[in-house]
Amino acid sequence: MKSTPYMRDLLLYSGQEDNYQVSSERIKKYLRVSADDSQIHRLCIYYGTLLEDELSSLENSVVEKTTELLEDLETEEVIYAMSDGCLLPTRPHQVETEQIGSWKEMKLGRIFREKDHLNLGEKPNLIRSSVYVSHFGKHHDFTSKLSSIIDPLVKLDERLVFINDGALWIANFIAAYYPNATDILDFYHASEYLHEFSKVIFSEKKEAAQKAQWVDKQTLRFFNDEIKEVIKEIEQLKLNGTTKIKAQEKILTYYKNNQLRMLYKSYKDRGLLIGSGPIESAHRFVLQKRMKQSGQKWTKKGGQAIANIRIFHLNNQWDNVVSLINKHTSNAA
């Protein structure tokens, strides 16, 4: 079916919202027009790839979205920058005589203002507006994209707040390019390490109460900026057996590498978030909702193309997609 630019607009929008078969059915139901799912697929890959190819020329408009975050920013207000990766299933590839599929990480960044993060009490918190960036590949390519939209915020110094899981690549990136920013280790990752370690050193059922007491003691230290005391106590544990010793080494390495990012009392005193819930939820509705459905497997090109279209939609920059459609019509499927 030949399609007008407006029809392609609708097909792309539908294709980034749900899988191609569902998109085709919706178009037929709403418009009484037949749109083959393979056509929607080809259009999404074509224009999503063009978005990646022309990202440098579109970069200024993405940067403008970040610059808008600075408008009407209150004197003490902060801007959060969070990033994390989620695993997506990829297409099997031939290795000798075996078909092998794998999971690859797509990285996602989310930037938002403090005032846009709304606490709704018993309901899940709401973030009214965010700027997103994604990359299906190596972390240095992702940080290149990420830095282009964070750079306008560098003048905020400590009011630019990063919250991450402690991955070395993101820690090094922040230290190198935004040394005056506030860098926080997601509290729930810090706590998870503590709980997993406690299961190893208090492995007997009869030690359950002792385990809970020990975890509570260390958690209280977290909220008193006493990470050094936590490290010291773990170091002084006399453990026997390979499993316990390896667990001790693992948690000590993690805490020592991140201790400057674990001053949770100081962060709470400033009224800052200490958890990475916003980026975890973004993974679900930005990427997984569309890209982790039953039976889906992605190529790097296809995965990045769909992510690009979704990102421009969720960044409220669909006009860029429409401009691209009007600019490139003859070669599309």
Regions inferred by a protein language model and the residue ranges of each:
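Catalytic center-proximal scaffold of phosphoryl-transfer enzymes
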Residues: 1-333
